Amino acid sequence: MLAKLLTKIFGSRNDRTLCRMSKAVDAINQMEPAMEQLSDEQLAAKTVEFRDCIAQGATVDSLLPEAFAVVREASKRVFGMRHFDVQLMGGMVLNDRCIAEMRTGEGKTLTATLPAYLNALSGKGVHVVTVNDYLAQRDAENNRPLFEFLGLSVGINLPGLPAPAKRAAYAADITYGTNNEYGFDYLRDNMAFSPEERVQRKLHYALVDEVDSILIDEARTPLIISGPAEDSSDMYRRVDKLIPHLIRQDKEDSESFQGEGHFSVDEKSRQVNLTERGLMLIEELLVKAGIMEEGESLYSPANIMLMHHVTAALRAHVLFARDVDYIVKDGEVIIVDEHTGRTMPGRRWSDGLHQAVEAKENVAIQNENQTLASITFQNYFRLYEKLAGMTGTADTEAFEFSSIYKLDTIVVPTNRPMIRKDLADLVYMTEKEKIDAIIEDIKTCTERGQPVLVGTISIEKSELVSGELEKAGIAHKVLNAKFHAMEADIVAQAGQPGAVTIATNMAGRGTDIVLGGSWQAEVAALESPDEQQIAAIKDAWQPRHEAVLAAGGLHIIGTERHESRRIDNQLRGRSGRQGDAGSSRFYLSMEDALMRIFASDRVSGMMRKLGMKPGEAIEHPWVTKAIANAQRKVESRNFDIRKQLLEYDDVANDQRCAIYTQRNELLDVADISETVKSIREDVLKTILDSYIPPQSLEEMWDVQGLEHRLKDDFDLDMPVAQWLDDEPGLHEEILRERVLEQMLAQYQRKEEIVGSDIMRNFEKGVMLQTLDSLWKEHLAAMDYLRQGIHLRGYAQKDPKQEYKRESFAMFAAMLESLKYEVISMLSKVQVRMPEEVEAMEQQRREEAERLARQQQLSHQAPVEELTQGSAAAAQEGRKVGRNDPCPCGSGKKFKHCHGKLQ
């Protein structure tokens, strides 16, 4: 109550911020006449002037009013578009490390040019982040003339570009690209083997378009660079055949309930749990299939990977549906983004889930992958010195932006008042009744020439509505993941009189729906149109535009509520842009996922009390409130999941930063011999301490063990026992120094043979390779730890604290292993004189020829075939270890057989 009273007196924080900014807007407007007097050359020269000011110590913020006035004037001359006052405010919000909520059609792309120009003046680079490649390319090309007029360079960071092109894109003053590509480039840079391979500069300023989609919807999806692991595709197929024998039951077994089914599904948490009966059946089926031994348990440690396969197969069949979560195209399973409805080629689910879905759909199963490097968007974007974002819908997630990213959300007013009518939800008992009502609404709209945009939550639902429209004889276009390439064209013309467009979720975000259709799109479709053709297209568009306005503008139909209110608002926001007329309505049924899982009891109780008849809809504030509460519950749950994910990932992030910092220091230093020397002393001290404890009696020394360890791990023949026999009074400290001297002397001899330059490069290469290999293993170990850590809660321990403690111990152990393995490898490496190398090569060739003759004489497969076979095996991911049996069937180890030929 008090808070409301104070807000009434002093205004909200948002109002006070806008009031402060309006003074800066007045200052910019006062500069406009002076800017108009400048010639093009004088206006462009302002950039050099600003850069000189920054070089002399001026801050970017102190230049804001004049810099914004320069961009506004340049935009008038280049595009014929003048930034509105509210767009200037939006630019200030973005410069202040905040999120600007600007409604659809308010010109976010043009607004972004203001802070992008201002922050590019420092010369540290600006990254404009978009949700897909099409928008990155479109925005870069659209804004390039403006920035180049002002003397700034523009780069586009697209997937698949060669390293020199990427480096050039990042070296530009302003770089456009997708969130995925920026993140992957960061990971790739931290896997580089020379400074020249890196493409990114220091991360300075990120300006994120559709910030809610990237920082919230995709926050739970880590970016992973992976390499192939062992092949287990056959096991996925064998286990997949067993799943159809299992029967679902409604709820989980408990003391009071024992079901007849084999598994239960928790739709809220998207988990599948085997019942006791199900476990017995699956064990029986696994034994019959010859996958498991009689009498074994699926939960025994030996069958941990088998349990992993069963769980993945069960989830693939029960939780993941074709044309909802994924599509099958050209024999490949492609994930559909649940938030945008777009396909994500190249993305794969982890933990064997993707392979299980491939087995279910009977397509080629690709190898499981092992993580080489990963980062979440939450942690990647927090690496920037300065972060800001813009979207049409951020206010509902303001708390999350503030608590996780330290970004305040400012709602920027619209240039013209919004007059869209948001009609109350209509709730039906069944899905069929709801679809029938939607078709009737569409018919009514098309009869009066009003365009309709129908929003669905999955491909399956969009095709269901499409099928019903076909039956009713209503012409329409479908925009979903299957027709991804036509997205922008379909959306651009969705405002034509009487047009009906079905869109999955918010596919097509970033493209405005113009009432009457886009005349610019019609012009773009023509090959080099002349002035007369353009004028004719504009003249034809004007009456269409007025007819649509008279019919009520664009009508939005939501076929069901999304889990998040924000995504519903995004759908509504496609209508009523720039003060245009428009309307929206959501149609719901008691069979919708959200209603069934979160709101069914309360709402169905209300419907029964109101005496609902088939085909009748309920339209009541109570129902709308119950649905909003259900959505808040889901949003709160999803926020908790993201927050928890971040808390766990922060532990890994600290370690990631430490490893990447160390790795970059290694790359940037030409000579790491001092580091190697220091590590060698540490390693040797640890080994000597374990066999010759400090200040201990000679009887406690394990001299024989020390000799074996030095020989096996460091290829050092140290007659320690002989030294002690020859010098009975040899002191422990002198012994330690002698071992170190011998080790250094052996290493020095190798360096004399190959030269110091080669040895320095070799040291760096060994250090980087070992670091990468151990980091990869550490990531896998962290994954396993993370998956089971929640069980510590049963022992009255805090899983997060346990995870921090254990992961730190694992990290410390990894760093010790790094030291040990680097020194071991450097000590064991054999160096040869050039003539020795040539003699060994000749011997190897003769041995290969002898083996080939032997095999032909004994009627075995020719060598070429066998080597091709092993190469094919390698291509398929079946890497043959040097100590594994040779694939030729000789019974010998690979290194003693065909491994000799490689």
From Swiss-Prot:
Residues 892-902 have a biased composition (Basic residues). SMART domains: SecA_DEAD, SecA_PP_bind. ATP binds at Q87, G105, E106, G107, K108, T109, D512. It catalyses: ATP + H2O + cellular proteinSide 1 = ADP + phosphate + cellular proteinSide 2. Its cofactor is Zn(2+). May bind 1 zinc ion per subunit. Keywords: ATP-binding, Cell inner membrane, Cell membrane, Cytoplasm, Membrane, Metal-binding, Nucleotide-binding, Protein transport, Translocase, Translocation, Transport, Zinc. Residues 851-902 are annotated as: Disordered. Its EC number is 7.4.2.8. GO terms for molecular function: ATP binding; metal ion binding; protein-exporting ATPase activity. It comes from the Bacteria. NCBIfam families: PRK12904.1, secA. Part of the Sec protein translocase complex. Interacts with the SecYEG preprotein conducting channel. Has a central role in coupling the hydrolysis of ATP to the transfer of proteins into and across the cell membrane, serving both as a receptor for the preprotein-SecB complex and as an ATP-driven molecular motor driving the stepwise translocation of polypeptide chains across the membrane. Belongs to the SecA family. This is Protein translocase subunit SecA.
